[in-house]
């Protein structure tokens, strides 16, 4: 299959298996959920009644005071006592096979092509690391919410995009399923397309 280059009167021949496969919603969902789960810090921690500081002495005798019976100041019922089901640090990451991950990326890229959300250009750059230059370039292309993927990370482009809302710049090795679906449009250079194709082959 061929992808038309927007800034040139030509087309780029690409693999049908990478940019023309059927959309596997279940696979994409599983990989996106796993990716988001892996980003969780999982460092929360609370103390149980066994871990909080406090005396082990019974606060008052069992009977005869008229008060409710009590055996410990560390009881979860008491103020400054332990937490009943205390949260502990945990690893939320989910295992995703390479084949599944690559399949999800191919599925997303193919769907972007079908929805006309993938724009392929010969090259994409700015002369200087100026936000104004990139903002004007995107305005000329009628792009607002956009992910720009280049073959090599262009420092000028990266610095120019840092202060733009809903604009991100990545190199081909930095793509992930969440960022590909998070933006309205994805702009890829011809070099990036070839690199992604080789990476997912």
UniProtKB/Swiss-Prot annotation:
GO terms for biological process: translation. The keyword Ribosomal protein applies. Residues 43-73 are annotated as: Disordered. Belongs to the universal ribosomal protein uL4 family. This is Large ribosomal subunit protein uL4. HAMAP family: Ribosomal_uL4_B (MF_01328_B). GO terms for cellular component: ribonucleoprotein complex; ribosome. Part of the 50S ribosomal subunit. One of the primary rRNA binding proteins, this protein initially binds near the 5'-end of the 23S rRNA. It is important during the early stages of 50S assembly. It makes multiple contacts with different domains of the 23S rRNA in the assembled 50S subunit and ribosome. Forms part of the polypeptide exit tunnel. Keywords: Ribonucleoprotein, Ribosomal protein, RNA-binding, rRNA-binding. InterPro entries: Ribosomal_uL4 (IPR002136), Ribosomal_uL4-like (IPR013005), Ribosomal_uL4_dom_sf (IPR023574). GO terms for molecular function: rRNA binding; structural constituent of ribosome. The keyword Phosphoprotein does not apply. It comes from Sodalis glossinidius (strain morsitans). It comes from the Bacteria.
């Amino acid at each position: 299959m061929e992808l038309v280059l927007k800034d040139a009167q030509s087309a780029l021949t690409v693999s049908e298996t990478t940019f023309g496969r059927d959309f596997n919603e279940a696979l994409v969902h599983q990989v996106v959920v796993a990716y988001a789960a892996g980003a969780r810090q999982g460092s929360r921690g609370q103390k149980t009644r066994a871990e909080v500081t406090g005396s082990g002495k019974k606060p008052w005798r069992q009977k005869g005071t008229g008060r409710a019976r009590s055996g410990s100041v560390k009881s979860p019922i008491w103020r400054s006592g332990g937490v009943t089901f205390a949260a502990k640090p945990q690893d939320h990451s989910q295992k995703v096979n390479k084949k599944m991950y690559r399949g999800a990326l191919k599925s997303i890229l193919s769907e972007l092509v079908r929805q006309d959300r993938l724009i392929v250009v010969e090259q994409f750059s700015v002369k200087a690391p100026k936000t104004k230059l990139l903002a004007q370039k995107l305005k000329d292309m009628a792009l607002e919410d956009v992910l720009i993927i280049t073959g090599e990370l262009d420092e000028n482009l990266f610095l120019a995009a840092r202060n733009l809302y809903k604009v991100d710049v990545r190199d081909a090795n930095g793509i992930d399923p969440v960022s590909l679906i998070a933006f309205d449009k994805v702009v890829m250079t011809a070099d990036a397309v070839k690199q992604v194709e080789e990476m997912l082959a």
